[in-house]
Curated annotation (Swiss-Prot):
Annotated keywords: Amino-acid transport, Glycoprotein, Lysosome, Membrane, Repeat, Transmembrane, Transmembrane helix, Transport
Organism in which the protein naturally occurs: Mus musculus
Membrane-spanning intervals of the chain: 38-58, 72-92, 97-117, 128-148, 183-203, 215-235, 255-275
Entry superkingdom: Eukaryota
Cited function: Amino acid transporter that specifically mediates the pH-dependent export of the cationic amino acids arginine, histidine and lysine from lysosomes.
Protein name: Lysosomal amino acid transporter 1 homolog
Motif mapping: Di-leucine motif: 290-291
Length: 293
């Protein structure tokens, strides 16, 4: 594995030692149980984010109304946030594993966007427009990402701490922000803002439709779980040597806001699922014919 060759050179910089495989794979200096728990939660959060879109793919194929159920601005905001993470993974010299994970998230978002336009164009008169435009959209996104992926340089670089879906990070320490840190902080803030703003159009769409039909709740449930675990993984990690807790939280503030802050909006969407589904169940029971006496 490419990222495995990057860990041996600076293992001595870990003051109290580290779990070897955690250092080899992530370059993370896991000094105690808190750091190990942080890495474990981060890994589970990645699995949650990676699996979150599959239920929506299945739901879209079953219902065929994804273009009505999901807000386009929700999808664009989501892919915008993940794209910022992808850009930041290159600017901040992230590990190849983290970069490939960021690429996967963007490709998963492109697949969601492809399904959206597939069902939107499918309603047009030309029967060929839907598959052609969907395939072209996915190919275009893949072509745009492939040069970035192929340009990943496997030369050893300063190692960042382990991250979940939000891959951007900055150097530890109490010193003022460097230019590189400022760029990462700005991109991370933009990413968090896009994640937050993306929920508002979806909440509005659900409210206007008074329905959540066509949306898989597993999409939001897994994202909520992933964001919770990621936020906890950041909070559980020990600050670096010589770094205060306040400095650590300040350096990671945008990503904490992007993960834990969005939970409030996802909770609102969860409430919409409960309310509108109860209405739909009641309406369906009213439409059932009365049994003959």
């Amino acid at each position: 594995m490419v990222w495995r060759t990057l860990g041996a050179s600076n293992f001595s910089t870990c003051p109290n030692g580290s779990v070897q495989w955690i250092w080899d794979v992530f370059g993370e200096c896991a000094q105690d149980g808190w750091d190990e728990a942080s890495v474990g939660l981060g890994l589970v959060s990645i699995l949650c984010f990676a699996a979150s879109t599959f239920p929506q793919y299945i739901k879209a194929c079953k219902t065929g109304n994804m273009d009505q159920a999901l807000s386009l601005w929700f999808l664009l905001g989501w892919i915008g946030g993940d794209s910022c993470n992808l850009i930041g993974s290159f600017l901040a010299d992230q590990l190849p594993l983290q970069t490939y994970t960021a690429v996967y998230y963007v490709l998963a978002d492109l697949m969601m966007l492809t399904l959206y336009f597939h069902y939107k164009f499918k309603k047009r008169p030309s029967p060929l427009s839907a598959p052609i435009n969907s395939v072209l959209l996915f190919i275009l996104g893949t072509v745009c990402i492939t040069p970035l992926l192929s340009s990943t340089d496997p030369v050893a670089v300063p190692r960042e701490g382990f991250r979940g879906r939000t891959l951007l990070s900055v150097e530890p320490g109490n010193k003022p922000f460097t230019k590189k840190e400022v760029i990462g902080f700005v991109i991370g803030s933009a990413s968090s803002l896009l994640y937050l703003l993306s929920r508002l159009p979806q909440i509005r769409t659900n409210f206007i439709r008074q329905s959540t039909q066509g949306i898989s709740y597993s999409l939001f449930a897994l994202v909520m779980l992933g964001n919770t675990l990621y936020g906890l993984s950041v909070l559980l990690k020990n600050p670096e040597v010589g770094q205060s807790e306040g400095s650590y939280l300040l350096h990671h503030l945008p990503w904490l806001v992007g993960s834990l802050g969005v939970l409030l909006l996802d909770t609102i969407i969860s409430i919409q699922f409960l309310v509108y589904r109860s209405h739909e169940t009641a309406a369906a029971s009213e439409r059932e014919p009365l049994l003959p006496s």
